[in-house]
């Protein structure tokens, strides 16, 4: 569960390493976001020479959360960290590589490009 002011690692090679959540998109007054949801973030840490710089305001989709998500068959999936992938307005990733596993719920949210780039889908 990602709230406003939550910090997340970035799981792609767009140049950002850590982001801070500004706003959860999808409805007025929405407080929390989970896997597959889009959030507006600002870049707090970045690598030199990357596509995005420190201080940039970007949109990102959440790919891993510590709190996890419940699936329809009753199982839960949790990860060791909160992570996101920076996306463009057309929901395509800004980076060309994805690091670490991503949840299968991204397939339901129509982020097929992220699922295809990921090394492992859990």
UniProtKB/Swiss-Prot annotation:
CDD domains: Ribosomal_uL14. Pfam families: Ribosomal_L14 (PF00238). One of its GO terms (cellular component) is cytosolic large ribosomal subunit. SUPFAM superfamilies: Ribosomal protein L14. Signal peptide: none annotated. One of its GO terms (molecular function) is large ribosomal subunit rRNA binding. Keywords: Ribonucleoprotein, Ribosomal protein, RNA-binding, rRNA-binding. One of its GO terms (biological process) is translation. Binds to 23S rRNA. Forms part of two intersubunit bridges in the 70S ribosome. Belongs to the universal ribosomal protein uL14 family. HAMAP family: Ribosomal_uL14 (MF_01367). NCBIfam families: rplN_bact (TIGR01067). Part of the 50S ribosomal subunit. Forms a cluster with proteins L3 and L19. In the 70S ribosome, L14 and L19 interact and together make contacts with the 16S rRNA in bridges B5 and B8. This is Large ribosomal subunit protein uL14.
